Each structure stands twice: as structure tokens, then as C-alpha cells.
């Protein structure tokens, strides 16, 4: 399994269990998810052991159903909010941080990143009202923000991440 982590914070953003594709210019990674519902807080009787029928029936523990996009739920991404002005301020600082990190780990990626990132940012800002914003589990404001949108069908969610803001960890 391959886990994609934020190079700034080390937060897990997504893994290779999803359908992943790279944008034409190689700047963005698009990860397709799906809407899911799952119970949380439920304890499986098989894990407890013993003979449940011989004991007094208990109401069990509270369980809640959580619904959302599988990428967000599985990797504990935290929702945040931006408008055009605040995202512009964030992305300027983020691009500087990624550039500095790339100079350390992949100097050959600095020029392509700085040349192509502004066009991607312009596309994002032009479509900003459609996006939901998610940060990693640590909620570090300096880290990567994943952008969630839905395909034209209105049902299929996908997330966008800056490729150069990710590090790959093989498990």
C-alpha cells in the first residue's frame, strides 16, 4: 500500500486504494472517492467472547452512523473553510513552503512547480465556490488543503491535491 502524506505536516492525506490520476501538466493529483455511511461506536460481539445468550440482555453501547466521503473519513481529514481572499493568502504562503521543501528534497521539481502552480491556483480560484476544503488530521494551518468537489453527475466526489506537496510512503 502507498500512503500519500503532506510534506509540510506529515499528515496522511490519502492512499492508493482510490482511483488516482494526475493532471495533464503534472501539477495536481485527482483522487476519486465515494459517499459512504458507517456505524461508529458499535462493539462486535465476536470480539467480546462468552455466550451472549446466557447473559442478561444489555442495550449495548451507543452507536452513531457517520456519512461522508470515504477519503475524508478514512484519513481523518478535517473540514475548514476559505473564501477567495483567505485562500489566496493561504496559497501564497503554502507555495513558498512547498518551494523551500522541494529545494531540499527534489531541486529538479522547483522550476516546473513555480511555472505551473499559478495556472492551477487561478483555476481553483475561478471555481472556489464549488470546493469544500480539508486539512490533515493535525489541522496545521501551514499544511496542505485538499479540495473536494463533485463530478457533473453530482454524486461522485473527488479531491484535488498539489502533487509536489505530497510525499509517498510505502507500507
Swiss-Prot record:
Stored InterPro entries: Mss4-like_sf, Mss4/transl-control_tumour, TCTP, Translation_control_tumour_CS, Translational_control_tumour_p
Family: Belongs to the TCTP family.
Official protein name in the record: Translationally-controlled tumor protein homolog
Pfam family of the protein (one): TCTP
Cellular location(s): Cytoplasm
PROSITE patterns in the record: TCTP_1 (PS01002), TCTP_2 (PS01003), TCTP_3 (PS51797)
GO cellular-component term (any): cytoplasm
An example Gene Ontology molecular-function term: calcium ion binding
SUPFAM superfamilies xrefs: Mss4-like
Function of the protein: Involved in calcium binding and microtubule stabilization.
Gene (UniProt): tpt1
Keyword terms: Calcium, Cytoplasm
TCTP domain: residues covered: 1-171
Amino acid at each position: 500500500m502507498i500512503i500519500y502524506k503532506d510534506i509540510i505536516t506529515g499528515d496522511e492525506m490519502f492512499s492508493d486504494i482510490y482511483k488516482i490520476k494526475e493532471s495533464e501538466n503534472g501539477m495536481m493529483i485527482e483522487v476519486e472517492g465515494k459517499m459512504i455511511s458507517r456505524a461508529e461506536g458499535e462493539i462486535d460481539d465476536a470480539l467480546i467472547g462468552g455466550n451472549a445468550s446466557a447473559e442478561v440482555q444489555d442495550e449495548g453501547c451507543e452507536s452513531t452512523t457517520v456519512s461522508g466521503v470515504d477519503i475524508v473519513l478514512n484519513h481523518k481529514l478535517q473540514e475548514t473553510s476559505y473564501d477567495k481572499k483567505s485562500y489566496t493568502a493561504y496559497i501564497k504562503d503554502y507555495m513558498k513552503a512547498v518551494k523551500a521543501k522541494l529545494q531540499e528534497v527534489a531541486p529538479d521539481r522547483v522550476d516546473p512547480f513555480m511555472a505551473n502552480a499559478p495556472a492551477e491556483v487561478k483555476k481553483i480560484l475561478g471555481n472556489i465556490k464549488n470546493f469544500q476544503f480539508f486539512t490533515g488530521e493535525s489541522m496545521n494551518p501551514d499544511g496542505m488543503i485538499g479540495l473536494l468537489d463533485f463530478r457533473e453527475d453530482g454524486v461522485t466526489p473527488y479531491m484535488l491535491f498539489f502533487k509536489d506537496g505530497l510525499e509517498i510512503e510505502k507500507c
